[in-house]
Amino acid sequence: MRFSAVAGRYARALLNVAIEKEKEEEYLRFLDLVCQIYESSRELFDNPILKPEKKISLIKEIMKSFGQEMDEFQERFLTLVFERKRQKLLRNIRDLFEYEKILSEQKVPANLSIAHSPEDEELSLLRKFVRKYALKDPVFDISIDESLIAGALVEFEGFRLDTTVQGRLKRIAREALKRGEMS
């Protein structure tokens, strides 16, 4: 996924407010809910005829139906986003907010692809590995991919560890092609 520089500025600004108010998790849940609301009715929220104030009041009403309230900073944030017609960046802003939040906690985001649901022991070993090289605790974004057959693929800070059967088979095939053993 490509991230927008504009989305990064919005995400960092909102994160700064969240850190100041000590409500990082609450603001992340707020962004999750706003993204779900926006994505479920994209045509409505992208309609140029509707005023930004009306769009925000609709979001407020929907949030109330879920038992959620919006504070003044969240409302001002949404006002800026909708007035400047940046609502299409909401998912990007949410993802960057989460990424920046992890970095602000002195942790490292890491992608973990694994063929099955990971057990605690496996996660512990992978945490130790990432800690050894990144010198920070990892926050795993876990995805299950059965095509890997077995093993795990970990990516963090530009580093990639591939212990999957699929990865090994690809390396063997690549080496065989280099040597001219396969035609």
From Swiss-Prot:
Question: What is the protein name given in its UniProt record?
Answer: ATP synthase subunit delta
Q: Name one GO biological process term.
A: proton motive force-driven ATP synthesis
GO molecular-function terms, A-Z: proton-transporting ATP synthase activity, rotational mechanism
Q: How does it assemble?
A: F-type ATPases have 2 components, F(1) - the catalytic core - and F(0) - the membrane proton channel. F(1) has five subunits: alpha(3), beta(3), gamma(1), delta(1), epsilon(1). F(0) has three main subunits: a(1), b(2) and c(10-14). The alpha and beta chains form an alternating ring which encloses part of the gamma chain. F(1) is attached to F(0) by a central stalk formed by the gamma and epsilon chains, while a peripheral stalk is formed by the delta and b chains.
* Membrane-topology descriptor: Peripheral membrane protein
Keyword annotations from UniProtKB, A to Z: ATP synthesis, Cell inner membrane, Cell membrane, CF(1), Hydrogen ion transport, Ion transport, Membrane, Transport
Main localization of the protein described in the UniProt heading: membrane
Q: Which domain of life is it from?
A: Bacteria
Its taxonomic placement starts with: Bacteria, Thermotogati, Thermotogota, Thermotogae, Thermotogales
User: Which species does the entry assign this protein to?
Assistant: Thermotoga maritima (strain ATCC 43589 / DSM 3109 / JCM 10099 / NBRC 100826 / MSB8)
